[in-house]
């Protein structure tokens, strides 16, 4: 009867007690598990500042944030998704937390304790219709699930440690020549464990399993990928660790948990992402309270959406998913969102590293950044105009170098653009366009003889040679004449032709000084009335033309005398008397004058010439002679030509005697 009563009381206690880790006792004063009593008088209090073996407790960090976050979560769930609010479990007792800590040989952080004392995770959402995970589809695990999942991951970590130890032992055995090498036979092709004879089982106790085809290894990969963390050195670079306590799961082997064994640059009780898909672990919050408060901020910002993929009205409001309210983009996995935020936070706080020797070693020759030696006499000005770039460590002043930035080196785009512009300025100087470049002509005056020497020569590409010659000719302005004035133009051309012939005659008779000089004087006297004919009113312009003509004659005389000294003797038949030639020219011109007087009065075009300095008169005469040669000479009577030749021969003989 007593035993029946005790069994009944134990059954009632099992359904009514909140201490899930405590057993029933008839006295009711203590709850004993394994014979060790715990005081339950202060079970409603949250224990803080517990001792952690080998580490310092984080204190009460995150407790206030955790309590504030749970108030907002309860309010939001009851308003927007009552079915989700119904999945939240009742609080844990203090004894439950203590026995869980004893089983795991840890002490939960204060923020985790406060969370468990508010809600012991979620109920079995898979068995409840229309229920989903609280953290955007991720389930918040209860205390019992936390203990089970922690033990599972600890088994994984222990197996990894044993595998690594076995691999190290095999490497040492291979490197040691003293130990005998055991030979492992080929796998038996029959089902079940094969029989092995004459093998040393003491050297390899697992030999029977190794050679069997039915033995399934626990780890499929021969070598795990390299493990890392963001930020670096904040989490230990291992696949699994006994100090990682999972609190949230996606039912696929990935978790959000607290790290009780952080890396050198980590923080105790930091919230991390780890699991089968995270070879690189991420720190997402400093403590559990900050993580829950971040989740509440996403809810308050509107980064959520309830999705119902079924037509069943009993299915509830739908699943809670993450959608960015600012962009209204697609549905995102919350683990990926946390991963991205952790990366961006680390990048924003990452300091800019200075230029190191490792990054200097990555310099290679190219033309992106150009350093060229500058002349010693104009070093300062050359650095401003020739694209001078400051030298960098490890570079030479006589070679072109370019900097290839590493992943940890930041180069300013403005500096690169500036350097490219300077390098272009040094390699290809700007050349003026020959079609559009202006031509500047400076005429030296008698008062400034050095002006012509000081004038800069125009670029060869800017002005063609023909254009340069035309600019130095005396300016001659002619009025446009109608077709009826063609005869007058012919007469002017004949005059220019005669002037050119007179010049050549002077060159041939330069050795006859008195006669030739008198002939040139007579020729000038004859040309003057012809040049002034038809324009008696423009006396000033004709005077200027006379001066130019006389200056040209003087220059030609000097040049001819110099040539005469070089040519001592010339054939006698080719010498022509200047006096006879002058007389012949005078007769021909008189004939032209008589013909001109018989022509009815017509407007004669005015020919004006600007006075040029002495330095340019020779060039003007050469250009005039070249122009006159190009024009067609008038037809000459053969008889008159013979008479002219005879007169010139007679005059030459007279002068020679």
Swiss-Prot record:
Single biological process term from Gene Ontology: regulation of mitotic cell cycle
Composition bias, Low complexity: 444-455, 473-482
UniProt similarity note: Belongs to the KNR4/SMI1 family.
GO CC, alphabetical: cellular bud neck; incipient cellular bud site
Biased amino acid composition, Polar residues: 174-187, 416-436, 505-521
Protein name listed in UniProt: KNR4/SMI1 homolog
Span list, region Disordered: 168-193, 366-402, 416-657
SUPFAM superfamilies, sorted: SMI1/KNR4-like
Coiled coil ranges: none
Bias (Basic and acidic residues): 492-504, 535-561, 569-604, 627-650
Cross-referenced InterPro entries: Knr4/Smi1, Knr4/Smi1-like_dom, Knr4/Smi1-like_sf, KNR4/SMI1_regulator
């Amino acid at each position: 009867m007593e035993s029946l009563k005790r069994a009944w009381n134990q059954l009632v206690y099992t359904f009514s007690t909140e201490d899930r880790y405590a057993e029933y006792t008839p006295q009711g004063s203590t709850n004993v598990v394994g014979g060790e009593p715990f005081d339950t008088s202060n079970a409603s209090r949250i224990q803080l500042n517990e001792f952690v073996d080998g580490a310092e407790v984080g204190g009460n960090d995150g407790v206030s944030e955790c309590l504030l976050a749970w108030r907002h979560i309860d309010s939001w769930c009851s308003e927007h998704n009552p079915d989700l609010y119904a999945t939240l479990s009742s609080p844990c007792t203090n004894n439950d937390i203590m026995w869980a800590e004893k089983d795991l040989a840890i002490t939960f952080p204060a923020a985790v304790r406060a969370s468990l004392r508010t809600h012991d995770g979620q109920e079995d959402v898979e068995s409840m219709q229309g229920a989903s995970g609280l953290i955007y589809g991720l389930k918040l695990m209860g205390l019992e699930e936390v203990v089970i999942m922690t033990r599972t991951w600890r088994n994984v970590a222990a197996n990894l440690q044993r595998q690594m130890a076995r691999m190290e032992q095999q490497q040492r055995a291979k490197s040691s020549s003293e130990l005998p090498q055991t030979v492992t036979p080929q796998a038996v092709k029959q089902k079940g464990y094969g029989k092995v004879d004459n093998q040393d089982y003491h050297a390899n106790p697992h030999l029977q399993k190794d050679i069997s085809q039915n033995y399934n290894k626990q780890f499929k990969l021969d070598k795990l990928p390299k493990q890392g963390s963001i930020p670096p050195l904040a989490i230990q670079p291992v696949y699994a660790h006994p100090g990682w306590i999972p609190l949230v799961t996606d039912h696929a082997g990935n978790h959000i948990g607290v790290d009780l064994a952080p890396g050198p640059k980590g923080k105790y009780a930091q919230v991390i992402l780890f699991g089968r898909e995270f070879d690189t672990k991420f720190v997402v919050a400093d403590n559990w309270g900050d993580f829950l408060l971040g989740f509440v901020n996403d809810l308050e910002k509107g980064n959520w959406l309830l999705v119902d993929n079924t037509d069943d009205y009993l299915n509830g409001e739908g699943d809670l998913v993450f959608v960015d309210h600012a962009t209204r983009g697609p549905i995102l996995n919350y683990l990926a969102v946390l991963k991205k935020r952790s990366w961006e936070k680390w990048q924003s706080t990452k300091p800019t590293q200075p230029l190191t020797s490792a990054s200097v070693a990555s310099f290679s020759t190219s033309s992106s950044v150009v350093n060229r030696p500058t002349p010693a006499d104009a070093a300062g000005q050359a650095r401003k105009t020739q694209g001078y770039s400051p030298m960098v460590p490890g570079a030479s002043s006589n070679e072109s170098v370019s900097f290839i930035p590493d992943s940890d080196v930041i180069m300013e785009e403005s500096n690169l653009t500036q350097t490219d512009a300077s390098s272009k300025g040094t390699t290809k100087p700007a050349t003026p366009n020959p079609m559009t470049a202006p031509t500047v002509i400076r005429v030296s005056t008698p008062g400034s003889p050095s002006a012509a020497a000081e004038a800069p020569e125009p670029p060869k590409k800017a002005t063609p040679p023909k254009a340069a010659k035309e600019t130095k000719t005396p300016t001659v302005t002619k009025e446009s004449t109608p077709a009826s004035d063609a005869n007058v133009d012919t007469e002017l051309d004949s005059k220019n032709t005669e002037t050119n012939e007179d010049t050549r005659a002077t060159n041939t008779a330069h050795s006859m000084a008195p006669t030739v000089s008198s002939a040139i004087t007579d020729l000038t006297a004859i040309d003057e009335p012809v040049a002034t004919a038809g324009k008696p009113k423009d006396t000033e312009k004709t005077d200027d033309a006379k001066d130019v003509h006389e200056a040209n004659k003087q220059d030609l005389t000097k040049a001819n005398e110099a040539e005469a000294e070089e040519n001592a003797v010339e054939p006698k038949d080719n010498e022509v008397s200047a006096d006879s030639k002058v007389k012949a020219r005078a007769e021909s011109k008189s004939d032209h004058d008589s013909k001109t007087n018989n022509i009815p009065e017509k407007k004669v075009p005015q020919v004006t010439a600007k006075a040029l300095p002495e330095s340019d008169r020779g060039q003007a005469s050469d250009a005039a002679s070249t122009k006159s040669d190009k024009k067609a000479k008038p037809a000459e009577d053969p008889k008159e030509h013979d008479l002219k030749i005879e007169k010139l021969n007679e005059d030459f003989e007279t002068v020679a005697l």
